């Protein structure tokens, strides 16, 4: 996992926050990496272990960047007639150098479910915190670009509503308890590909027999692109759940990769995505396996993850 908190536009993902690590290697040695604001001493070893999902060693200590307590904040909510128009606004905001802590876009289905608006409305939320001067400047850019791209100003209370319920997964748990298969799939892609990936991936996952609902939101933005976060739910017979789950993941992932997106933005690979790693990395997969062989020749660290060979013959997912 390369975790991305909900305010990552301001503070970064975990690989941006880690300053140094203590790692126990597969042979028992302990090393210390990083610790300086910036270094130029060969490859940055901290990044070798962050996101390696335990396949190269065990992280036992971490030194993280910290920030002063925010003294100001600002917020706004906007409604768009299309997902693509809102994506363009977000692109323009970050390309101007503004990095609001929260810049999130919900498609019509998720906007209706989370904010009670009509399904034709795509809700964009913006929130920033920090030094008041910087916050005001950031929110001014948000306002200017949203107005320039045809958004309707919605009530700022939608941002407060989001903060109050952002970690509430009770609705999903209700569906799961009724036998639905529910999961999420997050990816990243360049700005030019995002709208196409959104529409085609939703369509591909909906086309899998048994799918009842597929929706998406955009949750992490960068100058060159952003993250799309899909949620799907399906209802099939109990003995068909594994097959459905595999099929909907295959449909979504293949569509994303075909259209130039990534395999994962922050959740990582684990077992479920392992079958796609070789394709996603291309020639880089050989480098990854060479690093694994050099650091862990006996394959004792988290066998079978990241699509790497399992020295102990463990079953992958889906089971062959």
Residue ranges of predicted features:
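Short hydrophobic alpha-helical segments that form membrane-spanning helices or hydrophobic packing faces
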Residues: 60-62, 197-198, 274, 303-304
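FAD-binding subdomain of flavoenzyme oxidoreductases
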Residues: 1-104, 301, 317-320
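Acidic/polar loop patches that form or flank catalytic/metal-binding clefts of enzymes
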Residues: 31, 100-102, 152-155, 263-265, ...
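A glycine-biased, small/acidic residue-tolerant capping/turn segment at secondary-structure junctions
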Residues: 260-275, 304
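Short beta-alpha connecting loops at secondary-structure transitions
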Residues: 76, 182, 271-278
């Amino acid at each position: 996992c390369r975790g991305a908190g909900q305010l990552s536009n301001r503070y970064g993902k975990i690989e941006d926050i880690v300053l140094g690590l203590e790692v126990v290697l597969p042979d028992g040695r302990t090393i210390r990496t990083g610790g300086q604001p910036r270094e130029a001493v060969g490859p940055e070893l901290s990044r070798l272990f962050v996101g390696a999902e335990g396949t190269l060693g065990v992280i036992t200590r971490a030194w993280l960047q910290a920030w002063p307590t925010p003294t100001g904040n600002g917020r706004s909510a906007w409604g768009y007639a299309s997902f693509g128009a809102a994506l363009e606004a977000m692109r323009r905001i970050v390309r101007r150098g503004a990095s609001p802590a929260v810049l999130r876009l919900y498609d019509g289905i998720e906007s209706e479910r989370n904010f009670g608006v009509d399904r034709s409305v795509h809700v964009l939320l913006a929130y920033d915190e920090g030094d008041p001067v910087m916050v005001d400047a950031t929110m001014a850019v948000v306002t200017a670009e949203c107005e320039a791209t045809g958004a309707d100003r919605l009530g700022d209370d939608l941002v407060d509503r989001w903060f109050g319920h952002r970690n509430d997964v009770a609705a999903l748990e209700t569906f799961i308890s009724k036998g639905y298969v529910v999961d999420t799939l997050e990816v990243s892609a360049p700005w030019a590909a995002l709208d196409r990936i959104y529409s085609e991936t939703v369509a591909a996952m909906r086309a899998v027999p048994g799918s009842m609902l597929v929706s998406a939101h955009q949750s992490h933005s960068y100058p060159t692109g952003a993250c799309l976060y899909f949620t799907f739910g399906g209802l099939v017979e109990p003995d068909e759940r594994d097959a459905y789950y595999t099929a909907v993941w295959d449909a979504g992932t293949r569509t994303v990769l075909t259209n130039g997106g990534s395999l994962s933005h922050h959740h990582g690979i684990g077992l479920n995505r392992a079958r796609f790693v070789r394709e996603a990395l291309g020639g880089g997969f050989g480098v990854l396996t060479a690093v694994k062989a050099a650091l862990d020749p006996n394959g004792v660290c988290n066998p079978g993850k990241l699509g790497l060979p399992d020295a102990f013959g463990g079953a992958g997912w889906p089971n062959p």
